[in-house]
Amino acid sequence: MGVNWTKEQRQVIESRDRNLLVSAAAGSGKTAVLVERIIRMITDGERPGDIERLLVMTFTKAAASEMRERIHDAIEKKLKEDPGNEHLQQQAIMVQYAQITTIDSFCLHILREHFDCLDIDPAFRVGDEGEMLLLRGDVMEELLEDWYGRHDPAFENFVETYASGKADGGIDDYIYQVYSFSQSNPWPKEWIDECRRELSDTSVEALDRTGWMQFLLEDVRRQASEWAGQLQEAARLCSEEDGPGAYLPMILSDLSNAEKLREVSGYDSFVQAASGFEFPKLAAVRGKHSPVNPDKKEKVSECRKRIKKAVEKMKGQFLFASEEEILADLAGSSEAVLMLLTLAEDFAGRFEAKKRERNLVDFNDLEHLALQVLYREEKEGGEHRPSEAADLLAGQFDEILVDEYQDSNLVQEALIRAVSRERFGTPNVFMVGDVKQSIYKFRLARPELFLEKYHSYTKEDSLYQKIELHQNFRSRRQVLESTNDVFYRIMTENLGSISYTEETALHPGAS
């Protein structure tokens, strides 16, 4: 007896020839659906596909092993129904050699196949965690000893400013954190150079372009949008026959100020909009001829008090200085940050050299060396474009399937893009995950990659489609309702990058 798939699960299983993002909540049958999709791809139709023409990437080796086993078991089940099927017999054999793998293992495969494109010994090995930790410590010690010996004023000022306790307290951690973050970018040196350029540009326009200023302004616009919605509701209550009509002029004035904050595009426009957001005392309400509903009066009054408190908090947090004062402060601190970038870059070069001496690579190396194989840098403009090797790999895979996509980072995104067929006009990447379960930001995962697609892909049939699986087949209704009650209250776009709504909540899929 076949599985009774839901409508959404069938869509995931049967959709083809597109980039497909699947937002799969906990207990929604994600793995079963993924396996069924693969089985259908290699068994359905007059010309069924081959398992070796699929690239299936999982987050852990254990997940890859489980996926391979489940696919093999599903093929064997099909073979029992049709034992003479030569294609299925071949798939049962080839599943052991198929690219069902972690991204690190796939990168290692690329390096083994294309080591001639790189300046590395083909006999390299991947160092274990303990070995790399010791080597990293040796390199850091050597680096700091060297810099102390130079008596460089910028370095000495940096140490004096940021060292804690005796000796180098904390300096090595700062250096390694910047190095580690740079490695989460596809081209680390370019990221460091871009940071230097940003620090060197001290114009007002440059201030507005900085990442932290954009974050601040986006937060302001988001809050102002929420206030505008609440004030529109308050204005509606004021306009009703038994509403507090005397409050309406002030509420409309507040709404106008909130709308101005929604439109801020730079720090100067924010200062002007926020400074002008004042809250004069509400007019007295007298209902001689048309008594005012006390509940409506209270709702409007409380709404305004709540927004006033939030606006005052925002002013206290963000209206701390003029643009000129901020730029002066940044100029004063930029020397230390530039020194930190130099130290991180120096550490990267030394660490790389030590690893090459020992013919070692670490997991960062696997990904970045794979990018060297898959991309070539244009001489003019420095743009990175997929290489011939990338084009060959793109031709080998009919589809790329990525599990736990919410835990991908920018490096992995660049790798996936290089071996996909999107640049040829035939997108073929299947991504499944749940941004609500993203727990690896401390490892520099970028759940915003998932969110960008979630917000830009359409639910309609298209080349860039998203499908949501929110039915839970694992837990009882009472458990789901309790879970939803908690997350409706605590998961907001500001806190978890996505709002927990009726659409994204867990719904019972089994009685």
Roles of regions detected by a PLM:
Residues 4-8, 13-14, 19-23, 33, ...:
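Conserved helicase NTPase motor core
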Residues 29-30:
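Conserved glycine(s) of the Walker
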Residues 169-179, 468-511:
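Helicase-core coupling region on the C-terminal RecA-like lobe
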